[in-house]
Amino acid sequence: MKQHPTLFLVHFVATAAMTGLIWFVQVVHYPMFSDIPAEAFLTYEIEHQLRTSSVVIPFMMTEFLTGCYLALRSRPLLSGRDLMLFRGSMFLLAIVWGSTFLIQVPLHEELSQNADPYLIDSLVCTNWIRTICWSMRSLILGALMVQWLIIKE
């Protein structure tokens, strides 16, 4: 990591930001969807998608692009066990993206047409995939960062 510590730090910060955001969404935001009156829900859902996208897209793209660069061009930035851990964290990121575009986005599209309580429950339940994966990524990347800052310096 000595050659590109700033890039790794940017990657870690983007991941940590998404981890904090996803926990807020999981514990506060999505569960409150069921409290929105049915007559206001469709408008709310569309506005939610627009506003949320403007916050998460920059972080998700930063995380994805810096992660891909580090995973593909990591030697000698990362090697051995550290490289394996980092690539494992990228596998978790692939799960996050898969869950986002194969599960959460379609659920939001359905919710923008129909304020079905079952769809809201599905959104909350399936969002645990992303919450757990981003949390694990933060732990892995945080451990790598601490190791780099404390042990290797």
Predicted regions, residues:
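Mid-bilayer segments of alpha-helical transmembrane spans in multi-pass integral membrane proteins
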Residues: A94-L102
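Alpha-helical transmembrane segments of multi-pass integral membrane proteins
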Residues: S112-V146
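Short, charged juxtamembrane terminal tails flanking transmembrane helices
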Residues: M1, L149-E153
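Core segments of transmembrane alpha-helices
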Residues: F59-Y69, C133-L139
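Structural signal for the C-terminal ends of transmembrane alpha-helices
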Residues: Y69-P76, M145-I150
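Interfacial loop at the N-terminal end of multi-pass membrane proteins
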Residues: K2-T62, E109-C125
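Interfacial segments of alpha-helical transmembrane regions
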Residues: K2-A16, L77-A94
